[in-house]
A protein has these predicted regions:
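Active-site and NAD+-binding cores of ADP-ribose-processing enzymes
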Residues: 2-18, 31, 59-154
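Protein-protein interaction/assembly regions in multi-subunit complexes
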Residues: 22-23
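Short glycine/proline-enriched, acidic/aromatic patches that form the donor-sugar handling elements
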Residues: 26
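Extended catalytic/binding region for NAD+/ADP-ribose chemistry, centered on the ART fold
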Residues: 29-53, 125-130
Length: 154
């Protein structure tokens, strides 16, 4: 079994698995117009990903954490050796966005494992909410997530 985490603002919990945010704004591994859900291998990486995307403002308000589980056979693994040059730069490159877009177009798996930029020894996953196997992903009831005050009171 594969597991992952997603942390979202409580106000967005109902739409946390639609892929709409990524579809509207794009991301490192998808361009605007392609709906995907970003999740992280560990809850700490999910928190760090959220934190870095909110900088320079610290996260405020209520957050919820979801644990996801799915069979590993539903995951395609993108090989690090195939990463384009500058895959981890900011802003994200067209080449990395095309990786996710092409994966969605092919439709071979519901999950794509990609290396984390913030921690290259860990993985993030793209989930395709429109894939027929999306219903095979078990999503936990949300639990409250609190950012440590040492991170947000700086």
């Amino acid at each position: 079994m594969r597991s992952a985490w997603r942390i979202v603002r409580a106000a967005r919990a109902n739409s946390a698995f639609t892929g709409e945010g990524a579809r509207v704004y794009g991301g490192r591994w998808n361009s605007r117009g392609t709906a995907v859900v970003y999740v992280s291998e560990h809850e700490s990486l999910a928190a760090l990903e959220l934190f870095v995307h909110m900088m320079p403002m610290p996260p405020t308000g209520r957050y919820l954490s979801f644990r996801l589980e799915w069979e590993d056979k539903l995951t395609e693994y993108f090989q690090k050796k195939n990463l384009p040059p500058h895959w981890n730069t900011e802003p994200p490159t067209f080449e990395t966005m095309q990786i996710g877009d092409e994966w969605v177009r092919r439709g071979k798996s519901v999950a794509l494992a990609v290396p984390g930029v913030l921690s290259t020894s860990e993985m993030n996953f793209l989930l395709n909410p429109r894939h027929s196997d999306f219903k095979k992903i078990k999503i936990s009831e949300p639990i409250e997530y609190r950012f440590d005050p040492r991170l947000v009171n700086r």
